[in-house]
C-alpha cells in the first residue's frame, strides 16, 4: 500500500541498487508511510538528485500532504521546491528570519540574497524589471505569473 502511494509498486521486487536516486528516496518515504505518521520531517530529501529525481520527490511529498493529510516539514536549500509549500520559514543561524506564504517570502528577493538564498528565477527577473522601471506586481514568483504579467 505504501509503495503504491509513492508510485513504486512496480518496483517492489527490484534490487535497491538498480533504483535511481529519486526512486530510492520514494521507497524510503514509503517506509515512513508504512508507520502511518501524522507528520514527516524531510531534511534535504532531494540533495544529490538530478532535476527529474527532484521533481519526483516534490510530487510525492505534495501528494502525501494533499491526498493523505500528512503534515510535511520539508527542509531545503532549493527555493523552487519551497514554492510548493503552504508556508515557508526562512532561518538564518538558527533563528527565524521571516515566514509566510511562498508569495510573501519570495517577493523579498533582495532580503533573500543578503542572507545567501536565491529567490526563484521568475521572482528575480520580475524584481530586476521593476527596478528598471517596468510596472509589475510585487508578488510574481513563478514563470507562469511572469509570462502572464509581461503579456498584458
Identify what each model region corresponds to.
Residues 1-11:
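Conserved ABC ATPase "signature" region
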Residues 15-19, 23:
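Conserved ABC ATPase signature
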Residues 29:
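Hydrophobic anchor residue at the start of the ABC signature
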Residues 34-38:
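A short, proline-enriched helix->beta-strand linker immediately N-terminal to the Walker B motif
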Residues 40-43:
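Catalytic Walker B motif of ABC-type/P-loop ATPase nucleotide-binding domains
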Residues 99-100:
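ABC ATPase "signature
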Amino acid at each position: 500500500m505504501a509503495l503504491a502511494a509513492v508510485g513504486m509498486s512496480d518496483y517492489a521486487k527490484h534490487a535497491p541498487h538498480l533504483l535511481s536516486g529519486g526512486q530510492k528516496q520514494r521507497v524510503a518515504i514509503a517506509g515512513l508511510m508504512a508507520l502511518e505518521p501524522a507528520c514527516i520531517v524531510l531534511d534535504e530529501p532531494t540533495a544529490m538528485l538530478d532535476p527529474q529525481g527532484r521533481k519526483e520527490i516534490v510530487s510525492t511529498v505534495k501528494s502525501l500532504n494533499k491526498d493523505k493529510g500528512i503534515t510535511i516539514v520539508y527542509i531545503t536549500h532549493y527555493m523552487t521546491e519551497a514554492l510548493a509549500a503552504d508556508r515557508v520559514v526562512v532561518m538564518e543561524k538558527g533563528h527565524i528570519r521571516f515566514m509566510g506564504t511562498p508569495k510573501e517570502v519570495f517577493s523579498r528577493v533582495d532580503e533573500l540574497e543578503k542572507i545567501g538564498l536565491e529567490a526563484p528565477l521568475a521572482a528575480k527577473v520580475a524584481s530586476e524589471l521593476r527596478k528598471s522601471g517596468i510596472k509589475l506586481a510585487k508578488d510574481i514568483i513563478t514563470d507562469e505569473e511572469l509570462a502572464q504579467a509581461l503579456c498584458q
